[in-house]
Amino acid sequence: MPGEIQFTVNGKPSAITGDHPHLLSALRDELNLTSPKDGCSPSGQCGCCTVLIDGKAVVACQQSVDACEGREITTLEGLPESERQQFADAFAACGGLQCGFCIPGIVMRAHYQISKKGSSLTRESMAPHLGAHLCRCTGYVKILDAIEAVAHGTPVEPPTVKSGVGARGMKY
């Protein structure tokens, strides 16, 4: 890759100078953005590296850095803190995560769908979009519960754990 590739990442002008096989590598290795995860690169099968490019949800391991010249890229780090907290609370309250590796990509896809459909987003309309994501721990019912809660603005109470070593913890 000759020269420098410039684009906007999370609202800030950025430049990539290294040679990267795909956008995911550039985001993680050169820009130190760790929310896009590498679960399968470069096959694009797991959705863990989903980001927004010009507002559209795409997997970063399938995007060349050159193709991103002059474009707007948003990772989970670029969403407002209040929105990230809303997703975090909903996923925790609904039991929509276990290891959490896939969640940043799923949240970016959910954010994209909510930005398009708002509160009219239903679990039935969201479910096909989760086909682009592999969750090996939780399954999709609780993930859809969390996304639906965010889309509809349903207040959720994140679980509180009041226990110590050897005590029983709360189970979702």
Segment roles from a protein language model:
Residues 1-172:
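Signature of N-terminal electron-transfer/Fe-S-associated modules in redox systems
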